[in-house]
């Protein structure tokens, strides 16, 4: 797997779970002899929703909710066969979305 790169993008609502998952990925990759670049924090997406509290009158009475989507990027440069096998067997938290691309 010469001149290869594995790019791993992690997304989730809880930044502690994402940081824990990136630490596991980095530790696994370094243990198998690959170079790691990252974790790189990407911009957090903030979605805001405003909801009327009152069903009829009192237009000024509103609640505001926010969902933050945190993202991290990890590049694994020159991965070995052991690195790929270890990453496939890695168990990550349930609240983390992982996207892996080869390049």
Curated annotation (Swiss-Prot):
Family (UniProt): Belongs to the universal ribosomal protein uS10 family.
Gene Ontology terms: biological process: translation
Entries under Pfam families matching the protein: Ribosomal_S10 (PF00338)
Protein name (Swiss-Prot/TrEMBL): Small ribosomal subunit protein uS10
Keyword terms: Ribonucleoprotein, Ribosomal protein
One MF annotation (Gene Ontology) recorded for this entry: tRNA binding
The keyword Ribonucleoprotein is assigned to this record: yes
Subunit comment: Part of the 30S ribosomal subunit.
Organism: Shewanella frigidimarina (strain NCIMB 400)
Highest taxon of source: Bacteria
Cellular component annotations (GO), alphabetically ordered: ribonucleoprotein complex; ribosome
Known function: Involved in the binding of tRNA to the ribosomes.
SUPFAM superfamilies: Ribosomal protein S10
Gene3D superfamilies: Ribosomal protein S10 domain
Ribosomal protein listed as a keyword: yes
